[in-house]
Amino acid sequence: MSLRIDAVILAGGQARRMGGQDKGLVELLGKPMIEHAITRIQPQVKEILINANRNQNLYAQFADCVFGDEDSGFLGPLAGMVTAMGKTQADLLLVVPCDCPCLPTDLVARMAAALEAEAADLAVASDGEYEQPVVMLLKPSLRDSMKAFLAAGERKIDFWYAKHKVAVVSFADQPNAFVNVNTPEQVEQLSKALTQ
């Protein structure tokens, strides 16, 4: 029996370093940033969900399920993740940010393999040097744990996942896979790098 895997793309932040522009809709090489993430992720999952706290009508062109955080107040990525876990019927949920346009095309396969091999609750990607806390594959059954963590006033993803059995999956062979774009200058730099 194969597992159903859905993905949620997190686009719910305030994007302060992007001058308040909605990062997922900022264009990179003529396409919104989120479209780059979708192109990389779509073949790897059954359904894509988008967590967005603004411009939901614009995001609706990219996914059937677009939703805001259950708890208003921009509580960070965990708030989007906990909401997504309540909306999916999947066995596993892939979480990725909207501002990572170069995600690995073998992300799900490698993370699912590590999750199974290590009998872990979740898998977190690493660039070989640093863990990427907002790139993870997890069981939606962890929702209650995450809700309790948020209710206690906690916000840091890595503090939450440290409470569970975690498989860290290295993508050192793809050093630019998790390049994320936070400022207009970084958009320009990445545009140049991708067209060289």
UniProtKB/Swiss-Prot annotation:
It comes from the Bacteria. Disulfide bonds: none annotated. The keyword Nucleus does not apply. GTP binds at residues 10-12, 23, 51, 69, 99. Its EC number is 2.7.7.77. Transfers a GMP moiety from GTP to Mo-molybdopterin (Mo-MPT) cofactor (Moco or molybdenum cofactor) to form Mo-molybdopterin guanine dinucleotide (Mo-MGD) cofactor. This is Molybdenum cofactor guanylyltransferase. It comes from Shewanella amazonensis (strain ATCC BAA-1098 / SB2B). The gene is mobA.
